[in-house]
């Protein structure tokens, strides 16, 4: 489960690069939305991973 949290975090960082860095001007809105979606997914899977261990 922790593996998924790391994967979602990496995807969020890549989306942030495109969205906030101005690399893909046409897809800025989508990249910003994807960034927040994947950050939330990373946090949720990280918390679930911690709850499963304890």
Curated annotation (Swiss-Prot):
Pfam family for this entry, one: DUF1328
HAMAP family: UPF0391 (MF_01361)
Lineage, broadest ranks: Bacteria, Pseudomonadati, Pseudomonadota, Betaproteobacteria, Burkholderiales
Signal peptide residue numbers: none
The keyword Transmembrane helix is annotated on this UniProt entry: yes
Keyword Transmembrane helix tagged: yes
Residue spans crossing the bilayer: 5-25, 28-48
Bilayer topology annotation: Multi-pass membrane protein
Name of the protein in its database record: UPF0391 membrane protein Aave_3864
One GO CC term on file: plasma membrane
Alphabetical list of InterPro entries matching this protein: DUF1328
Keyword annotations: Cell membrane, Membrane, Transmembrane, Transmembrane helix
Compartment annotation: Cell membrane
Similarity remark: Belongs to the UPF0391 family.
């Amino acid at each position: 489960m922790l593996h998924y949290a790391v994967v979602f975090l990496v995807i969020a960082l890549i989306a942030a690069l495109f969205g906030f860095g101005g690399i893909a001007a046409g897809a800025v809105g989508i990249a910003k939305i994807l960034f927040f979606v994947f950050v939330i997914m990373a946090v949720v899977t990280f918390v679930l991973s911690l709850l499963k261990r304890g």
